[in-house]
Amino acid sequence: KKGVLTMDAILLSQDEVKGLITMKEVVEICNKTFQGLGDGTVINPTKVNLDLGETNPFPPYKGFMNAMPAYVGWADTAGIKWAGGFLGKRKEMGLPYITSLILLIDSEIGYFKAVMDGAHITNLRTGAQTANALRYMLNKKSIKLGLYGAGMQGHTQTHAISQLFDIEELRVYDVYKEAALKFAENMKDVVKGEIIVVDNPKDAAVGDAIVAVTQSKDKFIRNEWVKPGTIVFPMGSYQECDDEFILSADKIIVDHIGQALHRGALAESTEKGKITEENIFATIGELAAGKKECHISDDERILCVPIGTGAMDIAVASVVYKNAIEKGIGGKYKFA
């Protein structure tokens, strides 16, 4: 029955999830969850990484999986996302890079209340993280954006940022120019101003914010490209920015200190001992909760590294679950 809670788990496919949540909702859910991370009402252990050949030769599957548990106080929900990416056979089969499932439990009794696709939720919340970080750091409504990577995540980042800001100019670079041209066509109604497809990566490093969502293993964003007054978001699995920029940024902001130091843009500098916890100015949660302030000035450059936390996924999934129960959507399954 609609609106009735039982001990059955509900099962939700990606298509069902897509119909149960909007980007507008996700941006606000992530805002509340960042505040919870800042004030201690969200519990988010460091993700556990299983290397399936992403960085090691064995096993040879060119993939990884992460286990990402969290408890979100404002939603009173606990859960885990089991998610990863594969570039080997999965890519050959034409499947998306990311594979992802989210399990939710009743946090008081511990029964499994939902199992749902996590890929769409991951995509939306990854964009919403950036939008919220900008909300806490920029004191303006109209912004210019530089974007590296015109794939699914490039679209999602732009959608999310457009919920909170008017994008008056967007410069996009992709190694496949066709992808960038297609992006410009797809996003013309989302971006208020002009979308400029650039041939040289240097020409995309212009704006209030520079967002990189690529699978590049090259450190292609050069220190000398990044002008004062810019916030840079390297969101890929690897570094994307050169060492010089990482070590000379005026402030470093992260979503989760334990994770951000060991994966993504800061991992190599951490490994070499050049970056430590002492170098982190604040977490996005501290900014959201008002514990620290970081409004960018015209003469500083900020590096912001939101690696992604299970808390965001569980928070969004909790609202998807609530909407599914209210609308009577989803299959039922009794595990025990």
Predicted region positions:
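Short helix-loop-beta connector
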Residues: M137-K144, D166, K227-P228
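An anion/phosphate-binding loop that grips the pyrophosphate of nucleotide cofactors and donors
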Residues: G207-D208, A249
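NAD(P)-binding Rossmann-fold cofactor-contacting core
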Residues: L164-M187
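Short acidic low-complexity segments
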Residues: V191-G207, F220-E224
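N-terminal ligand-binding/catalytic initiation module
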Residues: G3-N123, A131, K141, A282, ...
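Rossmann-fold NAD(P) dinucleotide-binding segment
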Residues: A209, S216-F233, D243-E244
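Glycine-rich Rossmann-fold phosphate-binding loop(s) that bind the pyrophosphate
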Residues: A150-G151
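Adenosine-phosphate binding glycine-rich loop
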Residues: Q14-K18, F245-A336
